[in-house]
A protein has these predicted regions:
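PLP-dependent amino-acid enzyme catalytic core
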Residues: 1-197
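A short, hydrophobic C-terminal helix/tail in secreted or cell-surface proteins
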Residues: 198-202
């Protein structure tokens, strides 16, 4: 087994296992274990994708501050990547987030700012809107903006999707996934569409 120079090299290429003790009827059910990512979820993929794409474009300079609003695991993925790459990270999270998750974010080096969870998008204290404001008011800051960032679905279009298709040998009828920012849905849909188009051409 190889020795890796960075934990970021462990993101992706997660295993697939066949469900054995579940009643799946006439179907065969396979589970892709995204919990095997170093940060514990599929969000490691988009954290790496969004930060590295910004680096390649020149949007991120050494020592920059990253800012994002998150109510879920994206914060953990970003904290993992930011810590490894030496960026300061400010995360704006709703006050309903679990204490355990907040402790984890802080332990990984993120600055956590709590905001109200009882307001909707468009309100200045809504976590996404507040994160954008903080980014605009912080010199040298870069707003990740997972909900409008094309590098979010790209992580799945060029990463997760091709992995699944390769591991399954293209033999699958449906994919079931959770949906938040819609990055997983968009990226996997594009990957599957490209695969079926290529298969039809053959």
């Amino acid at each position: 087994m190889p020795i890796h120079s960075s934990v970021l090299e462990l993101i992706g290429q997660t295993p697939i296992v066949k469900a054995q003790r579940l009643d799946t009827g006439v179907c065969e059910l396979y589970l892709k274990l995204e919990s095997a990512n170093p940060g514990g979820s599929i969000k490691d993929r988009i954290g790496l994708s969004m930060i590295e794409a910004a680096e390649k474009r020149g949007d991120l300079k050494p020592g920059a501050t990253l800012v994002e609003g998150t109510a879920g695991n994206t914060g953990l993925g970003l904290a993992l990547v930011a810590q490894q790459k030496g960026y300061k990270l400010i995360l704006v999270v709703p006050d309903k987030m679990s204490r355990e998750k907040i402790f984890n974010l802080k332990a990984m080096g993120a600055e956590v700012r709590l905001t109200r969870s009882d307001v909707a998008k468009g309100h200045p204290e809504y976590y996404q809107d507040l994160a954008k404001t903080i980014a605009e008011q912080t010199p040298g800051a870069y707003f990740i903006n997972q909900f409008g960032n094309p590098d979010n679905p790209a992580a799945h279009e060029f990463g997760t999707g091709p992995e699944i298709l390769e591991q399954m040998g293209g033999d699958l009828d449906a994919i079931v996934f959770g949906c938040g920012s819609s990055g997983t849905m968009t990226g996997l849909s594009r990957a599957c569409l490209l695969y079926t188009s290529d298969a039809a051409d053959e």
